Amino acid sequence: MTNADPHELQKFSDLAHRWWDPNAEFKPLHDLNPVRLAWIDSHAHLAGKRALDVGCGGGILSESMAGLGAQVKGIDLSTEALGVADLHSLESGITVDYEAIAAEAIAAREPGTYDVVTCMEMLEHVPSPADIVAACATLVKPGGWVFFSTLNRNLKSYLFAVIGAEYIAQMLPKGTHDYARFIRPSELAGFVRATDLHIVEIKGITYHPLGKRFALSNDTDINYLVACRRAA
């Protein structure tokens, strides 16, 4: 059985044609992308590396990593999103190999293949995030890097990421997030400990509404990033 929620897949498929509009529903991803890309590159030094973007959607991060010199493959289960990603890759001239395949399936097919594996803003949308973490750990080479980002589960994250972002500021479409699926850092750390990965760094992401920008911080109450490495 595929580790995917059909409702979640449909939700993002319906918006696929808007993925590369920096002022539409995916504006937060466009605004967030430079911050997370720089953070990933600071650890993994992407140039010349083989990278896999799990849950790549329309390819915002995938193309950005390729633009820094990585050989990138992006996977997703939304064929609509992948169609948009392919088209944008042709328009931009930045080569990314996209495939509609589950993380667990590609992990069985290509274990220990990638220098870098990213799984950003995806874990909170799947029924079993632990299985995705395990798949990412299987996919990365010994000594390689795995990066996750997700949303913490607490009152503050509910107020800001759901009520604030979806209903008040309307930065995101209503229903984008299911609070019950948010993941505490301690829970994600538990998923990581069950694999061959170890956590190198956890950073928060803070949104500054006056400047309308994201920045790294030590506040992990809402959005947070986790850098992991597989033992060499």
UniProtKB/Swiss-Prot annotation:
Presence of the UniProt keyword Cytoplasm in the record: no
Upper taxonomic lineage: Bacteria, Pseudomonadati, Pseudomonadota, Betaproteobacteria, Burkholderiales
GO molecular function: 2-polyprenyl-6-hydroxyphenol methylase activity; 3-demethylubiquinol 3-O-methyltransferase activity; polyprenyldihydroxybenzoate methyltransferase activity
InterPro entries found in the cross-reference section: SAM-dependent_MTases_sf (IPR029063), UbiG_MeTrfase (IPR010233)
HAMAP family (alphabetical): UbiG
Residues binding S-adenosyl-L-methionine, per UniProt: 36, 55, 76, 120
UniProt-listed NCBIfam families: UbiG (TIGR01983)
Gene: ubiG
Family: Belongs to the methyltransferase superfamily. UbiG/COQ3 family.
Pathway: Cofactor biosynthesis; ubiquinone biosynthesis
Record organism: Burkholderia multivorans (strain ATCC 17616 / 249)
Primary enzyme class: transferase
Name of the molecule in the record: Ubiquinone biosynthesis O-methyltransferase
Entry superkingdom: Bacteria
GO biological process: methylation
CDD domains from the UniProt entry: AdoMet_MTases
Known catalytic reactions: a 3-demethylubiquinol + S-adenosyl-L-methionine = a ubiquinol + S-adenosyl-L-homocysteine + H(+); a 3-(all-trans-polyprenyl)benzene-1,2-diol + S-adenosyl-L-methionine = a 2-methoxy-6-(all-trans-polyprenyl)phenol + S-adenosyl-L-homocysteine + H(+)
EC number: 2.1.1.222, 2.1.1.64
The protein's role, per its UniProt record: O-methyltransferase that catalyzes the 2 O-methylation steps in the ubiquinone biosynthetic pathway.
Keywords: Methyltransferase, S-adenosyl-L-methionine, Transferase, Ubiquinone biosynthesis
